[in-house]
Every structure is written in structure tokens, then in C-alpha cells.
């Protein structure tokens, strides 16, 4: 069959290959010598898949049509794979109906992919991309609270108070919980990677919304600056990681036999005022706002990556490198002047 990869090569399936994280994950897996299957909703959409077609020059990459709502569409891409990376998630921040636009599809997507994994006898481990939004949202008070993999976002608070954009954290939390339930019931070796806000550069033709959010203090985008403030107020901090570290963490936990459970991937914890001060000093050529009135200057909590680091992972990028690369990326995209 044409879909078979060469014998002896490790094979990975990356679900949702057109995304920010998934496309870099595909690239890094190919560079490590993996044969890679990736799924996209519409392989005929040239704008969405052009960067994946370019990655085929790096190695053995096959692109499959699959839809998270269609369980059987994952059988072919997952067949014969050692690892399955489920990175795709439905995001509609402006949704009037998060329950049906995000929450149900996210849960259904996770379960459909995992069902396909149970039928493919080759799959050794499933790695699900969760989010810090599934960990950090609670009603605790104070500053300097440390949260780790034991913490879960308070779903009752989200669904009753319905703060702005509540659908996304609710969908990530409930999808991860559904994954753990399915994994336990079906004896699947599952690991979840929990990244914070991600920045750096992207292979995708469109600029990922997370880099836009991270760069908002530099670009002066008021709407996104308010988004950052909202993030700090809801989740307790502005926590950030480089997308490459997040992707390397996915591969690290897949390959590390002793790895188990959840892994937070966070390079730096800060607040909007602290971040603005840092950016204003580092990039004086951009007019970064530094006066935030009575907005809380300190973050409420610290998201700890201690478990991942103790497992043996080391972060390549600190906050300086993350922003240096993001600034260069925005310049290259014509979104920032020199």
C-alpha cells in the first residue's frame, strides 16, 4: 500500500497539522528521522497546507484528510504509528455558543482520535496538547501561589460566572478530563503537555493569534492588550513559553519511557505591568505602554514546570530570546517597523 512507511523507522501521527504548534512539531519530528503522518481538514486548501508541502523535502511526511467529528477518518493516518500527537483544538473566541462551537467538538475530537488509537495496535503512547487554561483558573486569593500538575481549572466557576472567552478554558479542561477518563478505561498510555501562552515564530502563512497576543504591548494593539489583561485577571498570571520548547517537550515526553501524567511547559511567569516594563527597556524603539493605573502589578500565581525539568528536560529559550525572535518574526511579516 502507498500509505506504508519504510520498516524500521519510528512513525508519528500529528493530528491537526496546519496549526502553529503542530506544523513545527511535524518539522522537528522529521528532523529527528521520524516518518510522519499528519491530518488536515482540507488538503486542497493551498494556503493552509503550503508549509506542510514544503516540509516534505525534510523527510517522509504524508498528509491525510481527517475531521475531528469523524472517528473513522483517523484510522488510516494512525495505522502503524508508534506515537500519536493530538494537537488540534476548535477555537472560536467570539463564539455566542461555546458549548456547541468549542466544548462538545473538543471532547468529541479527543475521544474520536483515542478510539482510533485503541484500534491501531501499533500505538505505544498518545500525547495530548492541553493548555495552562486547564490548570490555572480558580478563585484563590493572594500572590505567589504556585500551581502545578495537581491543579485543575474550576469548571463550576467558569460555567456559572461565564467570564469573557470562558469557552476556551472550559473546552481545554473538559477535553483533557475526557482524555484521562478514556485512557484509564481503555488502557491507553496517555501523556498531556500543558503549555502556556506561546510565542516565537511560525511556519504557518497566517500569524498565530497567540504570538499576536504576546506581541500586543509592542504593536500597541489595544484589543489584544485588553486580552492580555483579561488573561492575567482570569488565570492569575501572564505565563509564556517558546513554541519550539513546547514542541520539543512533546517529543521528549513521548520518547521518555518513565514519563507519565501531565507536564506543564512554561518558561516564564510575569504580569502585564512587569512584562511592559521589561519590553520597554529591551526595545526602546517601540512605544510600549508602562502606565497601567491601578491594574494589579504582580501576578497572582506561578505556573511551575518543575516536573518536566526534573524529568530531564531543559528549556532552550528564556523570556529575552522568546521576545527577540517574536520581534524579528513580526518585522519579517511586515507587522513591525525596525
Swiss-Prot record:
One of its GO terms (molecular function) is oxidoreductase activity. SUPFAM superfamilies: NAD(P)-binding Rossmann-fold domains. GO terms for biological process: flavonoid biosynthetic process. Optimum pH is 5.5. InterPro entries: Epimerase_deHydtase, NAD(P)-bd_dom_sf, NAD(P)_dehydrat-like. Disulfide bonds: none annotated. Pathway: Secondary metabolite biosynthesis; flavonoid biosynthesis. Keywords: Flavonoid biosynthesis, NADP, Oxidoreductase. Its EC number is 1.3.1.112. Gene3D superfamilies: NAD(P)-binding Rossmann-like Domain (3.40.50.720). Coiled coil: none annotated. It is an enzyme of class 1 (oxidoreductase). Optimum temperature is 45 degrees Celsius. It catalyses: a (2S,3R)-flavan-3-ol + 2 NADP(+) = an anthocyanidin with a 3-hydroxy group + 2 NADPH + 2 H(+); a (2S,3S)-flavan-3-ol + 2 NADP(+) = an anthocyanidin with a 3-hydroxy group + 2 NADPH + 2 H(+). NADP(+) binds at residues 18-21, 48, 87-90, 168. It comes from the Eukaryota. Pfam families: Epimerase. Expressed in leaves and grape berries. PANTHER family: ANTHOCYANIDIN REDUCTASE, NAD DEPENDENT EPIMERASE/DEHYDRATASE. Belongs to the NAD(P)-dependent epimerase/dehydratase family. Dihydroflavonol-4-reductase subfamily. Produces the terminal flavan-3-ol monomers required for the formation of proanthocyanidins or condensed tannins in leaves and flowers, as well as in the skin and seeds of developing berries. Catalyzes the double reduction of anthocyanidins, producing a mixture of (2S,3S)- and (2S,3R)-flavan-3-ols. Hyperbolic binding of NADPH and NADP(+) to the free enzyme, with a single binding site each. The most likely enzymatic mechanism is sequential ordered Bi-Uni-Uni-Bi, with NADPH binding first and NADP(+) released last. This is Anthocyanidin reductase ((2S)-flavan-3-ol-forming). It comes from Vitis vinifera.
Amino acid at each position: 500500500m502507498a500509505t506504508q512507511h519504510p520498516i524500521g523507522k519510528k512513525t508519528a501521527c500529528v493530528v491537526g497539522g496546519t496549526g502553529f504548534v503542530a506544523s513545527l512539531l511535524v518539522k522537528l519530528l522529521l528532523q529527528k528521522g521520524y516518518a510522519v503522518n499528519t491530518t488536515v481538514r482540507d488538503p486542497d486548501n493551498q494556503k493552509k497546507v503550503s508549509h506542510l508541502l514544503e516540509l516534505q523535502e525534510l523527510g517522509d511526511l504524508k498528509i491525510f484528510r481527517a475531521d475531528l467529528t469523524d472517528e473513522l477518518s483517523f484510522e488510516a493516518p494512525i495505522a502503524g504509528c508508534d506515537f500519536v500527537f493530538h494537537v488540534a483544538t476548535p477555537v472560536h473566541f467570539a463564539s455566542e455558543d461555546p458549548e456547541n462551537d468549542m466544548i462538545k467538538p473538543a471532547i468529541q475530537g479527543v475521544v474520536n482520535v483515542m478510539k482510533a488509537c485503541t484500534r491501531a495496535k501499533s500505538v505505544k503512547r498518545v500525547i495530548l496538547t492541553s493548555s495552562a487554561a486547564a490548570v490555572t483558573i480558580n478563585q484563590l486569593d493572594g500572590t505567589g501561589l504556585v500551581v502545578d500538575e495537581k491543579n485543575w481549572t474550576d469548571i463550576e466557576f467558569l460555567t456559572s460566572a461565564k467570564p469573557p472567552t470562558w469557552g476556551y478554558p472550559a473546552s481545554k479542561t473538559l477535553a483533557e478530563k475526557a482524555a484521562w477518563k478514556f485512557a484509564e478505561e481503555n488502557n491507553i498510555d496517555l501523556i498531556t503537555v500543558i503549555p502556556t501562552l506561546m510565542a516565537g515564530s511560525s511556519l504557518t502563512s497566517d500569524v498565530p493569534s497567540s504570538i499576536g497576543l504576546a506581541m500586543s504591548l509592542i504593536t500597541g494593539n489595544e484589543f489584544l492588550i485588553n486580552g492580555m489583561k483579561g488573561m492575567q485577571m482570569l488565570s492569575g498570571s501572564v505565563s509564556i513559553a517558546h513554541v519550539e520548547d513546547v514542541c520539543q517537550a512533546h517529543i521528549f515526553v513521548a520518547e521518555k519511557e518513565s514519563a507519565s501524567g501531565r507536564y506543564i511547559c512554561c518558561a516564564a511567569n510575569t504580569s502585564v505591568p512587569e512584562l511592559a516594563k521589561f519590553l520597554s527597556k529591551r526595545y526602546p524603539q517601540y512605544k510600549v505602554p508602562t502606565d497601567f493605573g491601578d491594574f494589579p502589578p504582580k501576578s497572582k500565581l506561578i505556573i511551575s514546570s518543575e516536573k518536566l525539568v526534573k524529568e530531564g528536560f531543559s528549556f532552550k529559550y528564556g523570556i529575552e530570546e522568546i521576545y527577540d525572535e517574536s520581534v524579528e518574526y513580526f518585522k519579517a511579516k511586515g507587522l513591525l517597523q525596525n
